[in-house]
Amino acid sequence: MSDPAEVPTASPLLETVGLACERDWRMLFERLDLRLAAGEMLQVVGPNGSGKTSLLRLLSGLMQPTAGEVRLNGRPLAEQRGELARSLLWIGHAAGIKGLLSAEENLTWLCALHQPASREAIWQALADVGLRGFEDVPCHTLSAGQQRRVALARLYLDAPPLWILDEPFTALDKQGVAQLETHLAGHCQRGGMVVLTTHHSLQQVPAGYRELDLGALKAASGATVEPALGDPA
């Protein structure tokens, strides 16, 4: 990664203020001040156990911080519980789909929880991720990579502006990885935001790519750290 550069001055749409996370009586990180604006991609890196997934879950509203708060569009996340589905999309490390349902049924169910989608839109999204002809196939018969594609098809529907993705490239083949990289970069170029963890070395990133090293944050004993602009590691 290149040397840290000046942090963009665009108004942050996602920010944390004094964020701290403790798990099993161990402080993973603290005093984290993070700002992310439209068009930016933040890759969270760090050794195992540094709190990467915990941070993503905090940003998604799936966990409560030990201290501090997360703000989305200038408002505390805790005040937006009923609105989060319109503002952010979380896809975790596991595919999160139901094996007895077909690919189409899984997407219909997932979209109904957030933003309902037409059958035509769902079929097109499945085609976009290379699953044309698998719409009615029970997901338990699909490979791990195909199941991952079903989950990622949500990114090709009417998705919210903020995407929070935990290891999205897991189980994807080379073609699937390249396609997803292009799609994520395009989302940022259109004014969206992406926060992700991945062990994959990114080859395509938007101009607003940034990196947050939780290992460095821990080594600094919780000092406030701004993510650095830079090339993917």
Swiss-Prot record:
ABC transporter domain segment(s): 14-233
GO biological process: cytochrome complex assembly
Coiled coil (UniProt feature): none
Annotated family: Belongs to the ABC transporter superfamily. CcmA exporter (TC 3.A.1.107) family.
Gene Ontology cellular-component annotations: plasma membrane
Subcellular compartments: Cell inner membrane
PANTHER family: ABC TRANSPORTER I FAMILY MEMBER 1 (PTHR43499:SF1)
Keyword Cell inner membrane: yes
Entry keywords, A to Z: ATP-binding, Cell inner membrane, Cell membrane, Cytochrome c-type biogenesis, Membrane, Nucleotide-binding, Translocase, Transport
Chain segments annotated as transmembrane: none
Organism: Pseudomonas aeruginosa (strain ATCC 15692 / DSM 22644 / CIP 104116 / JCM 14847 / LMG 12228 / 1C / PRS 101 / PAO1)
Ligand binding (ATP): G46, P47, N48, G49, S50, G51, K52, T53
An MF annotation (GO) of this entry: ATP binding
Membrane topology, as annotated: Peripheral membrane protein
Name of the protein: Cytochrome c biogenesis ATP-binding export protein CcmA
Function: Part of the ABC transporter complex CcmAB involved in the biogenesis of c-type cytochromes; once thought to export heme, this seems not to be the case, but its exact role is uncertain. Responsible for energy coupling to the transport system.
Subunit structure: The complex is composed of two ATP-binding proteins (CcmA) and two transmembrane proteins (CcmB).
EC number, as in UniProt: 7.6.2.5
Listed SUPFAM superfamilies: P-loop containing nucleoside triphosphate hydrolases
Top EC group: translocase
